[in-house]
Amino acid sequence: RSPRVFWRGEVANHAAHAGKRKGYPCKSERGNHARLAALALMADDPSHFDVKCNVGCEARDATKWPCPGLAYDATMRKIYADNSSIRDPKFYTEPDYANYKYVLNLPGKTDGSYSRNLNHLWYVGAAVLLWDTPAVEWYYPALKHGATHAAINRTTARAVVEALDASPDKYSRLLAGARRVQKELT
């Protein structure tokens, strides 16, 4: 398995809806912001992260459409200006995900289910990393950081992955936890 964290998906720009809603729909932006932050992990540390857009990759213009609490850091601004390094047009299936040691779940779009992507991650044989987000799925109460998954964000991701790499027991616990979630909850 590749020792990196894997994710593929979309960052969608909601600017087309701004005129209809009298301003940028910042309430719909949390998932995109998390996705752009995860893409910044790849830009900063490709040896640990294989996180790319394979569909749309059009982030919000944070200067034109600022959203409270959703500012971009320097790497995120760089990606906004030129996203060529974090694009991958290939479509990946579950066997492709199984080639990675870690799989990442990021918040989804408000017009789709967050759990739709997460449901297939539990059974690919990799440790599941969940982006730390206020979004809650129906089975989240049954999940426990360190037992079923590891929670990460922009600032903790690398340290969490390095700690799991340094502890085969913790990593094995996450694999067993993912199998349990797949068997009992999905």
Give a label for each model feature.
Residues 91-186:
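Catalytic binding pocket for nucleotide-activated donors in carbohydrate/polymer assembly enzymes
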Residues 1-86:
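Phosphate-/polyanion-interacting regions in eukaryotic proteins
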